[in-house]
């Protein structure tokens, strides 16, 4: 089977991290976002992954060529010369997608969830129509476009954009499986699959919804990235508790790379990921944070709901909170307070940031 992953966006909502790497290569729980998706696809029997690329495509190509060998699959690049929306990339990759007549997966690159790829194949083959959308239940459907479908069969009746009165609490999760016939509906131009292709398919009875059972999060912005991290760690707790770090000073779900060094008298967790080569000095307190490869947290620093980008340094007695995000190679001097700061790569912070703002 094949899968097309839409990785062409600029990732502006996840800046400053996406100023250093394209969004699919940002580390999520110690592994690039894209790799979580690709490994789940491979596990479900996918042998050919096509990446619809544009922004920083060289970096993506280099990283994924290394993974291609490790995973024993074929990875192809489909280069967009102009942004093609969410449907145009399917037309661009048409030749690759129609090398055989099997159905194929399509994924948005921001999605982290309990990927239900095997179930999707079974469900899609059972109804035998052109398309299947995975839907997920949300608390506040008014913020999204919702999907209205027959609960028994899953046949989609209509879509309602940001409803003000309750019609459904199921939304499009950004995971699809299509039969090749769907490609006859899509032209090679900027096109929205959600607004231009899906409504026509639903009207013709060719589109079905399958409900996701596990967790789901669109991690395209820092606040949601951290929420998604908490959900992912809880899922790890249920499925692979042996991956999590335990011992004195560790609280709840904590993922620590084996190459990280942790000092004495630290309090780490709940919901923390610590990447490769990270050094955490004595007396550090971390909760609900991700600390990326090669960073250093100096003694007695205190971090909550923050993201520390690659190779950054947080000084002694620093306090960081409220979705503070440090880009790559940021230095925060000793004894400062950062509240909701968004710090661009290669900056040195020498004064406190008491109110949320971007540090250029």
Swiss-Prot record:
GO molecular function, one term: mannose-1-phosphate guanylyltransferase (GTP) activity
Protein name: Mannose-1-phosphate guanyltransferase beta-A
Broad class of enzyme this protein falls into: transferase
Protein family (similarity comment): Belongs to the transferase hexapeptide repeat family.
Pathway: Nucleotide-sugar biosynthesis; GDP-alpha-D-mannose biosynthesis; GDP-alpha-D-mannose from alpha-D-mannose 1-phosphate (GTP route): step 1/1
Gene Ontology CC: cytoplasm
Keyword GTP-binding: yes
Encoding gene (name): gmppb-a
Gene Ontology terms describing biological process: GDP-mannose biosynthetic process; protein glycosylation
Keywords from the UniProt entry: GTP-binding, Nucleotide-binding, Nucleotidyltransferase, Transferase
Entries under CDD domains matching the protein: M1P_guanylylT_B_like_N
Domain of life: Eukaryota
Species classification: Eukaryota, Metazoa, Chordata, Craniata, Vertebrata
EC number annotated for this UniProt entry: 2.7.7.13
PANTHER family registered for this protein in UniProt: SUGAR-1-PHOSPHATE GUANYL TRANSFERASE
A Pfam match: GMPPB_C
Catalysed reaction, written as an equation: alpha-D-mannose 1-phosphate + GTP + H(+) = GDP-alpha-D-mannose + diphosphate
NAD recorded as keyword: no
């Amino acid at each position: 089977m094949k899968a097309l992953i839409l990785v062409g966006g600029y990732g502006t909502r996840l800046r400053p991290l996406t100023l250093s790497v394209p969004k699919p290569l940002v580390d999520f729980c110690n592994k690039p976002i894209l790799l979580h998706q690709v490994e789940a696809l491979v596990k479900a029997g996918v042998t050919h992954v096509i990446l619809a690329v544009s922004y920083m495509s060289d970096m993506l190509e280099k990283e994924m060529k290394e993974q291609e060998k490790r995973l024993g699959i074929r990875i192809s690049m489909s280069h967009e010369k102009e942004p093609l929306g969410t449907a145009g990339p399917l037309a661009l990759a048409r030749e690759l997608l129609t090398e055989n007549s099997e159905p194929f997966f399509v994924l948005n690159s921001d999605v982290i969830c309990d990927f239900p790829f095997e179930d999707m194949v079974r469900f899609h083959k059972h109804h035998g129509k052109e398309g299947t959308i995975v839907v997920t239940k949300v608390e506040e459907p008014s913020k999204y476009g919702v999907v209205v479908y027959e609960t028994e069969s899953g046949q989609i009746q209509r879509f309602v954009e940001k409803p003000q009165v309750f019609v459904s609490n199921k939304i499009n999760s950004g995971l699809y499986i299509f039969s090749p016939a769907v490609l006859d509906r899509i032209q090679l131009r900027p096109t929205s699959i959600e607004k231009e292709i899906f409504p026509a398919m639903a009207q013709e009875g060719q589109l079905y919804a399958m409900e996701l059972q596990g967790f789901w999060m669109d991690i395209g912005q820092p606040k949601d990235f951290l929420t998604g991290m908490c959900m992912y760690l809880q899922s790890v707790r249920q499925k692979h508790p042996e991956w999590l770090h335990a011992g004195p000073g560790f609280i709840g779900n904590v993922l620590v790379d084996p190459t990280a060094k942790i000092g004495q008298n630290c309090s780490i967790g709940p919901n923390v990921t610590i990447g490769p080569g990270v050094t955490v000095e004595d007396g550090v307190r971390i909760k609900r944070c991700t600390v990326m490869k090669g960073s250093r947290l100096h003694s007695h620093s205190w971090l909550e709901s923050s993201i520390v980008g690659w190779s950054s340094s947080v000084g002694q007695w620093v306090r960081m909170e409220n979705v503070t995000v440090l880009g790559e190679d940021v230095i925060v001097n000793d004894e400062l307070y950062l509240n909701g700061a968004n710090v661009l790569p290669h900056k040195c912070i020498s004064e406190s940031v008491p109110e949320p703002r971007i540090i250029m």
